[in-house]
Amino acid sequence: MLIAGDWSESRSGGVFEVKNPANGEVITELPDGGRTDAARAIDAAYGAFPAWAAATAYDRSAILYRAWQLMIERKDHLAHTMTVEQGKPLRAAITEVQYAADFLLWFAEEAKRVYGETIPSARPDQRFIVMHQPVGVVAAVTPWNYPVSMITHKVGPALAAGCTVVLKPAEATPLC
């Protein structure tokens, strides 16, 4: 599991198997995170929040744009992984990876459009200013059936808005 930018084992040392649904073959074993690991991830996300929230909209946009580029470059590999892990036909997996990447591109552009508002007041000496600000850590739990696109659909807007994220993928499709 990835916590605070580092790959780590679960504190319990437990693992679970990821299997190919077509033949039952074990693809890999991954750390079986528990409450302690979740708490570490949440603490790390809170620790990273001030710096990420302070990043400019253009900086966040550039990072999301780079993530989009990387997904496009690795589309075939990601689709193959999805096919082996989930059983989705390769053509459908390629389509999903493209769809998922496009969410990142969309939110890379939306990150630059976090506009505020000035609202007139009934009093001549006042006006109301609305500023959109990051709210904190976002918890994202994703399903097995559209694992890649649901990750980018949830993580993309959170990162664009300046929030940090703790992602819990479906146990059936943690590699996607």
Segments from the language model and where they lie:
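Conserved small-residue-rich beta-alpha loop and adjacent elements
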Residues: 117-176
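Glycine-rich loop-to-alpha-helix module at the N-terminal edge of alpha/beta enzyme cores
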Residues: 25-115, 125
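Alpha-helix N-cap/helix-start motif
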Residues: 11, 38, 75, 93, ...
